[in-house]
Amino acid sequence: MSPSDVPINWKRNLTVTWLGCFLTGAAFSLVMPFLPLYVEQLGVTGHSALNMWSGLVFSITFLFSAIASPFWGGLADRKGRKIMLLRSALGMAIVMLLMGMAQNIWQFLILRALLGLLGGFIPNANALIATQVPRHKSGWALGTLSTGGVSGALLGPLAGGLLADHYGLRPVFFITASVLFICFLLTFFFIRENFLPVSKKEMLHVREVVASLKNPRLVLSLFVTTLIIQVATGSIAPILTLYVRELAGNVSNIAFISGMIASVPGVAALLSAPRLGKLGDRIGPEKILIVALIISVLLLIPMSFVQTPWQLALLRFLLGAADGALLPAVQTLLVYNSTNQIAGRIFSYNQSFRDIGNVTGPLMGAAISASYDFRAVFCVTAGVVLFNAIYSWNSLRRRRLAIE
Protein backbone atom coordinates (compact mmCIF):
# COMPACT_ATOMS: atom_id res chain seq x y z
CA MET A 1 0.00 0.00 0.00
CA SER A 2 1.47 3.37 -1.03
CA PRO A 3 1.52 6.27 1.47
CA SER A 4 -1.20 8.04 -0.49
CA ASP A 5 -3.51 5.03 0.00
CA VAL A 6 -3.16 5.03 3.80
CA PRO A 7 -6.44 6.24 5.37
CA ILE A 8 -6.28 9.70 6.90
CA ASN A 9 -6.96 9.99 10.63
CA TRP A 10 -9.12 13.11 10.27
CA LYS A 11 -9.80 13.25 14.02
CA ARG A 12 -6.07 13.61 14.72
CA ASN A 13 -5.80 16.24 11.99
CA LEU A 14 -8.76 18.07 13.55
CA THR A 15 -7.05 18.05 16.96
CA VAL A 16 -3.75 19.35 15.55
CA THR A 17 -5.38 22.01 13.34
CA TRP A 18 -7.49 23.10 16.34
CA LEU A 19 -4.27 23.57 18.30
CA GLY A 20 -2.73 25.39 15.33
CA CYS A 21 -5.74 27.73 15.06
CA PHE A 22 -5.57 28.31 18.83
CA LEU A 23 -1.88 29.26 18.64
CA THR A 24 -2.45 31.43 15.55
CA GLY A 25 -5.44 33.19 17.16
CA ALA A 26 -3.40 33.77 20.32
CA ALA A 27 -0.37 34.99 18.35
CA PHE A 28 -2.40 37.55 16.40
CA SER A 29 -4.20 38.89 19.48
CA LEU A 30 -1.12 38.87 21.76
CA VAL A 31 0.06 42.18 20.29
CA MET A 32 -3.37 43.85 20.01
CA PRO A 33 -3.62 45.40 23.53
CA PHE A 34 -0.46 47.49 23.10
CA LEU A 35 -0.45 48.14 19.33
CA PRO A 36 -1.04 51.93 19.81
CA LEU A 37 1.68 51.99 22.50
CA TYR A 38 4.17 50.37 20.11
CA VAL A 39 3.19 52.87 17.39
CA GLU A 40 3.95 55.64 19.91
CA GLN A 41 7.26 53.99 20.82
CA LEU A 42 8.22 54.06 17.12
CA GLY A 43 8.08 57.87 17.16
CA VAL A 44 4.46 58.81 16.38
CA THR A 45 3.31 61.69 18.60
CA GLY A 46 0.14 63.74 18.82
CA HIS A 47 -3.39 62.46 19.45
CA SER A 48 -4.68 62.61 15.86
CA ALA A 49 -1.48 61.15 14.33
CA LEU A 50 -1.47 58.32 16.88
CA ASN A 51 -5.11 57.50 16.12
CA MET A 52 -4.49 57.57 12.37
CA TRP A 53 -1.38 55.35 12.44
CA SER A 54 -2.94 52.92 14.94
CA GLY A 55 -5.93 52.53 12.62
CA LEU A 56 -3.66 52.07 9.60
CA VAL A 57 -1.41 49.39 11.12
CA PHE A 58 -4.49 47.54 12.38
CA SER A 59 -6.51 47.57 9.15
CA ILE A 60 -3.69 47.12 6.60
CA THR A 61 -3.20 43.49 7.70
CA PHE A 62 -6.81 42.61 6.86
CA LEU A 63 -6.69 44.58 3.61
CA PHE A 64 -3.65 42.72 2.28
CA SER A 65 -5.03 39.41 3.55
CA ALA A 66 -8.18 40.03 1.48
CA ILE A 67 -6.02 40.64 -1.61
CA ALA A 68 -3.73 37.63 -1.09
CA SER A 69 -6.26 34.99 0.05
CA PRO A 70 -7.54 33.99 -3.44
CA PHE A 71 -3.95 33.48 -4.67
CA TRP A 72 -3.06 31.23 -1.71
CA GLY A 73 -6.38 29.39 -2.09
CA GLY A 74 -5.58 28.60 -5.73
CA LEU A 75 -2.10 27.42 -4.74
CA ALA A 76 -3.64 25.22 -2.02
CA ASP A 77 -5.85 23.54 -4.64
CA ARG A 78 -2.74 22.92 -6.78
CA LYS A 79 -0.13 21.96 -4.18
CA GLY A 80 -2.16 20.85 -1.14
CA ARG A 81 -3.40 22.44 2.08
CA LYS A 82 -0.67 21.20 4.43
CA ILE A 83 2.07 23.05 2.55
CA MET A 84 -0.04 26.23 2.78
CA LEU A 85 -0.37 25.77 6.55
CA LEU A 86 3.41 25.40 6.80
CA ARG A 87 4.01 28.46 4.60
CA SER A 88 1.61 30.56 6.63
CA ALA A 89 2.92 29.57 10.08
CA LEU A 90 6.60 29.98 9.16
CA GLY A 91 6.03 33.19 7.18
CA MET A 92 4.10 34.82 10.02
CA ALA A 93 6.73 33.70 12.56
CA ILE A 94 9.49 35.43 10.56
CA VAL A 95 7.42 38.61 10.10
CA MET A 96 6.58 38.77 13.83
CA LEU A 97 10.28 38.43 14.63
CA LEU A 98 11.06 41.35 12.30
CA MET A 99 8.26 43.45 13.84
CA GLY A 100 10.06 43.27 17.17
CA MET A 101 13.10 44.79 15.43
CA ALA A 102 11.25 47.61 13.60
CA GLN A 103 12.94 51.02 14.00
CA ASN A 104 10.26 53.31 12.59
CA ILE A 105 6.55 53.40 11.80
CA TRP A 106 7.02 52.82 8.05
CA GLN A 107 8.93 49.59 8.63
CA PHE A 108 6.21 48.46 11.02
CA LEU A 109 3.43 49.36 8.55
CA ILE A 110 5.13 47.37 5.75
CA LEU A 111 5.59 44.39 8.07
CA ARG A 112 1.89 44.53 9.10
CA ALA A 113 0.99 44.45 5.38
CA LEU A 114 3.38 41.52 4.88
CA LEU A 115 1.70 39.72 7.79
CA GLY A 116 -1.59 39.97 5.91
CA LEU A 117 0.00 38.74 2.67
CA LEU A 118 1.57 35.69 4.34
CA GLY A 119 -1.39 34.81 6.59
CA GLY A 120 -4.13 32.32 5.89
CA PHE A 121 -3.55 29.54 8.42
CA ILE A 122 -7.17 29.38 9.60
CA PRO A 123 -8.91 29.33 6.15
CA ASN A 124 -6.49 26.64 4.97
CA ALA A 125 -7.13 24.65 8.16
CA ASN A 126 -10.86 24.92 7.42
CA ALA A 127 -10.31 23.74 3.82
CA LEU A 128 -8.15 20.80 4.97
CA ILE A 129 -10.69 19.57 7.52
CA ALA A 130 -13.65 20.23 5.19
CA THR A 131 -12.10 17.94 2.54
CA GLN A 132 -11.26 15.14 5.01
CA VAL A 133 -14.17 14.94 7.45
CA PRO A 134 -17.26 12.87 6.55
CA ARG A 135 -19.93 15.20 5.12
CA HIS A 136 -22.48 14.30 7.82
CA LYS A 137 -20.04 15.55 10.49
CA SER A 138 -18.99 18.76 8.71
CA GLY A 139 -21.00 21.08 10.97
CA TRP A 140 -19.63 19.62 14.18
CA ALA A 141 -16.04 19.49 12.87
CA LEU A 142 -15.99 23.06 11.51
CA GLY A 143 -17.81 24.34 14.61
CA THR A 144 -15.21 22.67 16.83
CA LEU A 145 -12.36 24.02 14.68
CA SER A 146 -13.75 27.56 14.96
CA THR A 147 -13.41 27.40 18.76
CA GLY A 148 -9.62 27.08 18.37
CA GLY A 149 -9.18 30.55 16.89
CA VAL A 150 -11.78 31.99 19.28
CA SER A 151 -10.02 30.51 22.34
CA GLY A 152 -6.67 31.87 21.22
CA ALA A 153 -8.14 35.30 20.49
CA LEU A 154 -9.67 35.38 23.99
CA LEU A 155 -6.51 34.42 25.85
CA GLY A 156 -4.12 36.36 23.60
CA PRO A 157 -4.89 39.92 24.79
CA LEU A 158 -4.71 38.87 28.45
CA ALA A 159 -1.37 37.12 27.96
CA GLY A 160 -0.07 39.94 25.74
CA GLY A 161 -0.91 42.59 28.33
CA LEU A 162 0.78 40.64 31.14
CA LEU A 163 3.89 39.91 29.05
CA ALA A 164 4.18 43.54 27.92
CA ASP A 165 3.94 44.73 31.55
CA HIS A 166 6.68 42.35 32.68
CA TYR A 167 9.08 42.26 29.72
CA GLY A 168 8.32 45.33 27.58
CA LEU A 169 6.72 45.65 24.15
CA ARG A 170 9.40 44.31 21.78
CA PRO A 171 9.92 40.94 23.56
CA VAL A 172 6.21 40.14 23.07
CA PHE A 173 6.79 40.06 19.29
CA PHE A 174 9.65 37.57 19.79
CA ILE A 175 7.43 35.41 22.04
CA THR A 176 4.67 35.59 19.41
CA ALA A 177 7.12 34.48 16.71
CA SER A 178 8.06 31.50 18.91
CA VAL A 179 4.37 30.56 19.30
CA LEU A 180 3.91 30.63 15.52
CA PHE A 181 7.05 28.52 15.02
CA ILE A 182 5.61 25.92 17.42
CA CYS A 183 2.50 25.98 15.21
CA PHE A 184 4.75 25.29 12.20
CA LEU A 185 6.42 22.32 13.93
CA LEU A 186 3.08 20.79 15.02
CA THR A 187 1.78 21.07 11.46
CA PHE A 188 4.96 19.62 9.94
CA PHE A 189 5.17 16.56 12.19
CA PHE A 190 1.55 15.66 12.98
CA ILE A 191 -0.76 16.68 10.11
CA ARG A 192 -1.19 14.19 7.28
CA GLU A 193 -2.68 14.86 3.87
CA ASN A 194 -3.01 12.62 0.81
CA PHE A 195 -2.83 15.13 -2.02
CA LEU A 196 -1.88 14.62 -5.65
CA PRO A 197 -0.46 17.92 -7.01
CA VAL A 198 -2.36 19.39 -9.95
CA SER A 199 -0.53 21.04 -12.85
CA LYS A 200 -1.32 24.65 -13.71
CA LYS A 201 -2.89 23.53 -17.02
CA GLU A 202 -5.29 21.18 -15.20
CA MET A 203 -6.38 23.86 -12.74
CA LEU A 204 -9.91 25.17 -13.14
CA HIS A 205 -10.07 28.86 -14.06
CA VAL A 206 -12.35 31.22 -12.13
CA ARG A 207 -15.17 30.81 -14.68
CA GLU A 208 -14.87 27.01 -14.44
CA VAL A 209 -14.82 27.21 -10.63
CA VAL A 210 -18.11 29.13 -10.72
CA ALA A 211 -19.56 26.66 -13.26
CA SER A 212 -18.60 23.70 -11.03
CA LEU A 213 -20.57 25.08 -8.07
CA LYS A 214 -23.91 23.45 -7.37
CA ASN A 215 -25.48 26.84 -6.72
CA PRO A 216 -23.26 29.85 -7.57
CA ARG A 217 -25.81 32.43 -6.35
CA LEU A 218 -26.09 30.74 -2.98
CA VAL A 219 -22.29 30.59 -2.60
CA LEU A 220 -22.05 34.32 -3.38
CA SER A 221 -24.78 35.03 -0.80
CA LEU A 222 -22.77 33.01 1.75
CA PHE A 223 -19.70 35.17 1.02
CA VAL A 224 -21.84 38.29 1.59
CA THR A 225 -23.15 36.76 4.82
CA THR A 226 -19.58 36.27 6.04
CA LEU A 227 -18.78 39.91 5.22
CA ILE A 228 -21.87 41.19 7.09
CA ILE A 229 -21.16 38.99 10.13
CA GLN A 230 -17.72 40.62 10.41
CA VAL A 231 -19.12 44.11 9.75
CA ALA A 232 -21.64 43.58 12.57
CA THR A 233 -18.95 42.34 14.95
CA GLY A 234 -16.42 45.04 14.01
CA SER A 235 -18.85 47.98 14.07
CA ILE A 236 -19.23 47.67 17.84
CA ALA A 237 -15.52 47.23 18.61
CA PRO A 238 -14.40 50.91 18.35
CA ILE A 239 -17.17 52.25 20.59
CA LEU A 240 -17.53 49.46 23.16
CA THR A 241 -15.18 50.85 25.84
CA LEU A 242 -16.63 54.36 25.47
CA TYR A 243 -20.20 53.01 25.64
CA VAL A 244 -19.35 51.01 28.78
CA ARG A 245 -17.85 54.16 30.34
CA GLU A 246 -21.06 56.07 29.50
CA LEU A 247 -23.13 53.33 31.20
CA ALA A 248 -20.84 52.79 34.21
CA GLY A 249 -20.10 56.41 35.03
CA ASN A 250 -16.98 57.37 36.97
CA VAL A 251 -15.57 54.02 38.16
CA SER A 252 -11.93 53.08 38.70
CA ASN A 253 -11.99 49.65 37.02
CA ILE A 254 -13.46 50.68 33.66
CA ALA A 255 -10.70 48.83 31.74
CA PHE A 256 -11.51 45.56 33.51
CA ILE A 257 -15.28 45.94 32.96
CA SER A 258 -14.77 46.81 29.28
CA GLY A 259 -12.40 43.89 28.79
CA MET A 260 -14.85 41.50 30.41
CA ILE A 261 -17.77 42.75 28.27
CA ALA A 262 -15.58 42.53 25.15
CA SER A 263 -14.66 38.91 25.89
CA VAL A 264 -18.03 37.40 26.94
CA PRO A 265 -19.27 36.83 23.33
CA GLY A 266 -16.15 34.77 22.64
CA VAL A 267 -16.73 32.64 25.75
CA ALA A 268 -20.35 32.05 24.68
CA ALA A 269 -19.30 31.18 21.11
CA LEU A 270 -16.75 28.75 22.52
CA LEU A 271 -19.54 26.91 24.34
CA SER A 272 -22.16 27.06 21.59
CA ALA A 273 -20.26 26.48 18.31
CA PRO A 274 -19.66 22.69 18.54
CA ARG A 275 -23.15 22.03 19.91
CA LEU A 276 -24.93 24.14 17.30
CA GLY A 277 -22.68 22.66 14.61
CA LYS A 278 -23.80 19.17 15.68
CA LEU A 279 -27.44 20.33 15.66
CA GLY A 280 -26.87 21.74 12.16
CA ASP A 281 -25.67 18.30 10.99
CA ARG A 282 -29.01 16.93 12.19
CA ILE A 283 -31.54 19.58 11.10
CA GLY A 284 -29.57 21.43 8.41
CA PRO A 285 -27.06 24.34 8.67
CA GLU A 286 -29.40 26.65 6.71
CA LYS A 287 -31.96 26.56 9.57
CA ILE A 288 -29.23 27.28 12.13
CA LEU A 289 -27.96 30.20 10.02
CA ILE A 290 -31.33 31.95 9.61
CA VAL A 291 -32.42 31.45 13.25
CA ALA A 292 -29.04 32.69 14.56
CA LEU A 293 -29.25 35.82 12.35
CA ILE A 294 -32.79 36.61 13.59
CA ILE A 295 -31.76 36.08 17.23
CA SER A 296 -28.78 38.42 16.64
CA VAL A 297 -31.15 41.16 15.43
CA LEU A 298 -33.41 40.68 18.47
CA LEU A 299 -30.39 41.00 20.80
CA LEU A 300 -28.69 43.96 19.08
CA ILE A 301 -31.76 46.25 19.30
CA PRO A 302 -32.10 46.15 23.14
CA MET A 303 -28.35 46.83 23.47
CA SER A 304 -29.09 50.41 22.45
CA PHE A 305 -31.51 50.76 25.40
CA VAL A 306 -29.51 49.17 28.25
CA GLN A 307 -28.91 51.20 31.41
CA THR A 308 -26.08 49.26 33.09
CA PRO A 309 -22.89 47.49 31.93
CA TRP A 310 -24.18 44.16 33.29
CA GLN A 311 -27.30 44.33 31.10
CA LEU A 312 -24.98 44.87 28.13
CA ALA A 313 -22.76 41.97 29.25
CA LEU A 314 -25.75 39.59 29.44
CA LEU A 315 -27.01 40.57 25.98
CA ARG A 316 -23.50 40.25 24.50
CA PHE A 317 -23.13 36.78 26.04
CA LEU A 318 -26.39 35.67 24.38
CA LEU A 319 -25.29 37.34 21.13
CA GLY A 320 -22.00 35.43 21.26
CA ALA A 321 -23.89 32.14 21.69
CA ALA A 322 -25.89 32.90 18.52
CA ASP A 323 -22.85 34.20 16.62
CA GLY A 324 -20.95 31.00 17.45
CA ALA A 325 -23.23 29.22 14.97
CA LEU A 326 -22.95 31.70 12.10
CA LEU A 327 -19.52 31.20 10.50
CA PRO A 328 -19.50 27.38 10.99
CA ALA A 329 -22.97 27.24 9.38
CA VAL A 330 -21.73 29.31 6.42
CA GLN A 331 -18.63 27.10 6.07
CA THR A 332 -20.72 23.91 6.22
CA LEU A 333 -23.02 25.23 3.47
CA LEU A 334 -19.93 26.06 1.40
CA VAL A 335 -18.75 22.45 1.84
CA TYR A 336 -22.17 21.16 0.72
CA ASN A 337 -22.13 23.35 -2.41
CA SER A 338 -18.57 22.85 -3.67
CA THR A 339 -16.19 20.00 -4.47
CA ASN A 340 -12.88 19.10 -2.79
CA GLN A 341 -11.10 20.13 -6.00
CA ILE A 342 -11.93 23.82 -5.42
CA ALA A 343 -12.25 23.87 -1.60
CA GLY A 344 -9.05 25.90 -1.13
CA ARG A 345 -10.25 28.70 -3.38
CA ILE A 346 -13.80 28.72 -2.02
CA PHE A 347 -12.57 29.05 1.57
CA SER A 348 -10.00 31.68 0.54
CA TYR A 349 -12.66 33.76 -1.25
CA ASN A 350 -14.73 33.50 1.92
CA GLN A 351 -11.71 34.70 3.92
CA SER A 352 -11.34 37.70 1.59
CA PHE A 353 -14.94 38.73 2.28
CA ARG A 354 -14.29 38.21 5.99
CA ASP A 355 -11.24 40.48 5.86
CA ILE A 356 -13.18 43.18 3.98
CA GLY A 357 -15.77 43.02 6.78
CA ASN A 358 -12.99 43.33 9.37
CA VAL A 359 -11.84 46.57 7.71
CA THR A 360 -15.25 48.15 7.00
CA GLY A 361 -16.99 47.22 10.27
CA PRO A 362 -14.93 49.45 12.60
CA LEU A 363 -15.06 52.29 10.04
CA MET A 364 -18.87 52.04 9.94
CA GLY A 365 -19.15 51.98 13.74
CA ALA A 366 -16.83 54.96 14.16
CA ALA A 367 -18.67 56.98 11.48
CA ILE A 368 -22.14 56.31 12.97
CA SER A 369 -21.05 57.11 16.53
CA ALA A 370 -19.38 60.33 15.35
CA SER A 371 -22.49 61.43 13.41
CA TYR A 372 -25.11 60.34 15.94
CA ASP A 373 -24.26 58.54 19.19
CA PHE A 374 -23.12 55.18 20.55
CA ARG A 375 -26.64 53.75 20.81
CA ALA A 376 -27.30 54.38 17.12
CA VAL A 377 -24.50 51.95 16.22
CA PHE A 378 -26.45 49.01 17.64
CA CYS A 379 -29.65 49.98 15.78
CA VAL A 380 -27.88 50.38 12.43
CA THR A 381 -25.97 47.12 12.96
CA ALA A 382 -29.27 45.36 13.74
CA GLY A 383 -30.65 46.73 10.45
CA VAL A 384 -27.64 45.39 8.52
CA VAL A 385 -28.00 41.93 10.11
CA LEU A 386 -31.76 41.95 9.43
CA PHE A 387 -31.03 42.65 5.75
CA ASN A 388 -28.60 39.73 5.81
CA ALA A 389 -31.21 37.41 7.36
CA ILE A 390 -33.77 38.29 4.65
CA TYR A 391 -31.16 38.05 1.88
CA SER A 392 -29.88 34.67 3.14
CA TRP A 393 -33.40 33.28 3.60
CA ASN A 394 -34.31 34.31 0.06
CA SER A 395 -31.13 32.71 -1.38
CA LEU A 396 -31.73 29.46 0.53
CA ARG A 397 -35.42 29.43 -0.48
CA ARG A 398 -34.45 29.75 -4.16
CA ARG A 399 -32.06 26.82 -3.77
CA ARG A 400 -34.78 24.70 -2.17
CA LEU A 401 -37.27 25.57 -4.94
CA ALA A 402 -34.64 24.74 -7.60
CA ILE A 403 -34.06 21.32 -6.00
CA GLU A 404 -37.81 20.63 -5.84
From Swiss-Prot:
Keywords: Cell inner membrane, Cell membrane, Membrane, Transmembrane, Transmembrane helix, Transport. PROSITE patterns: MFS. It is a multi-pass membrane protein. It is found in: Cell inner membrane. It holds the Pfam family MFS_1. Its main location: membrane. One of its GO terms (cellular component) is plasma membrane. The chain crosses the membrane at residues 19-39, 56-76, 90-110, 113-133, 144-164, 171-191, 222-242, 254-274, 288-308, 317-337, 376-396. The keyword Transmembrane helix applies. The keyword Cell membrane applies. Belongs to the major facilitator superfamily. DHA1 family. MdtG (TC 2.A.1.2.20) subfamily. InterPro entries: MFS, MFS_dom, MFS_MdtG_subfamily, MFS_sugar_transport-like, MFS_trans_sf, Mutidrug-R_MdtG, Tet-R_TetA/multi-R_MdtG-like. GO terms for molecular function: transmembrane transporter activity. This is Multidrug resistance protein MdtG. HAMAP family: MFS_MdtG.
